[in-house]
Design a protein with these regions (language model features):
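CBM-like carbohydrate-recognition segments
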Residues: 160-177
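Aromatic-lined, polymer-binding surfaces characteristic
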Residues: 1-157
Length: 177
């Protein structure tokens, strides 16, 4: 499936393309990570090869990243679950492609972006979420993508869970009330 997408997917388009690229892209990139490190090519089995990694990196850089970058560079216009989803995928591409500047861009967005998906804009000091007046489902999505992003960073040795006095935890506590 991943090889098929990497060889045919040329564009992600539509009014929700950043959200699609962030949410669905994250599932694909996680699957690619599993394939890359679990099913290695060997003399007995046609597993995941370096060529497969290069092909999928090309798809993430040339199809997904332009959509994500357009969103990141635009004036904020969406609820925070969009920005969080987009930024999580930017970070994941940075990790998968061993692109430290791209990873650092995602960390900077997490802390400093004007977008509603940055940590200080999505979760207030009280724990209230930017979408708390909307519905629980979108709040769960928004705080969930921030936690997934923090987990990706944790695997790299960066503790974003503790950011801004454990703001993600405060968001979960507020959400659970």
């Amino acid at each position: 499936i991943l090889r098929g997408y990497a060889s045919t997917l040329q564009k992600i388009y539509g009014p929700d393309d950043p959200l699609c690229a962030g949410l669905q892209g994250f599932m694909l990139i996680n699957a690619a990570e599993i394939m890359r490190y679990t099913y290695q090519d060997n003399q007995y089995v046609k597993g995941w090869s370096e060529a497969d990694t290069k092909s999928i990196e090309g798809m993430f850089r040339n199809v997904f990243l332009p959509v994500l970058t357009t969103f990141v560079q635009a004036k904020p216009y969406a609820n925070g679950n969009w920005g969080g989803s987009v930024n999580k995928m930017v970070m994941a591409i940075g990790i998968f492609c061993n692109d430290e500047p791209l990873y650092n861009q995602a960390v900077d967005f997490f802390y400093n972006s004007r977008d509603n998906g940055s940590l200080p804009n999505y979760i207030a000091e009280t724990g209230q979420l930017q979408e708390s007046g909307r519905d629980q489902a979108h709040c769960m999505l928004g705080v969930g993508v921030l936690a997934e992003l923090a987990e990706c960073a944790w695997k790299k040795g960066d503790n974003l869970y503790a950011a801004l006095d454990n703001r993600i935890m405060k968001g979960y506590e507020y959400l659970s009330k």
